[in-house]
Amino acid sequence: MTIYNKTIFRQADSRWGSLPYPTSSYSFAGNGCGCCAVAHCAIELENFKNYTPANFRKYMVQFATKGNGTLWNGITKGLEHYGFNVHWRQADTMEDIWKVLKKSLKKGVILFGSSKGGTKRVTWTTSGHFVAFVDWKYENGDYWFYCKDSGGRKHDGWFSYKQHMAGDVRNVWICTSLKSGYKFIGSS
């Protein structure tokens, strides 16, 4: 497994949940899932291992929209700002995503829509939600993602694409490589 930091952030945490995102009319608790997803990827790096969403919010708030959380390009910009080269794909065909995943760092962000996903009909959100994955594997004919979910449903741990996600994945941001000057926790 290549998970370097086990910390899981909740966007409603009292330390940052009441912070404005983007304005005082919209709280981080209700709109900060995109920022938390970027944070979950970035804390895997030595440079940001002790950061919290309050630290990441300072940069990410410029990509927040009133009542709609983080813009899609904000996820790309955030991951790039915090040390990753990123490949973004709309999930119109997962085959393209699987090809990129096989050459990736096993980290990224998934945007879920508002339907129930997979054969087990899992509810990830009722309106759209960003969730980080910090590892993945292919096992028994299915792709599995190790997710860190900042939302109240707390979908943390291993989730199967077929059983838990199929039909509800809208976009995927895949961290393909590290930029110069960045390294994973514990690596030389």
Kindly label every feature range from the protein language model:
Residues 50-98:
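Catalytic cysteine-centered active-site loop
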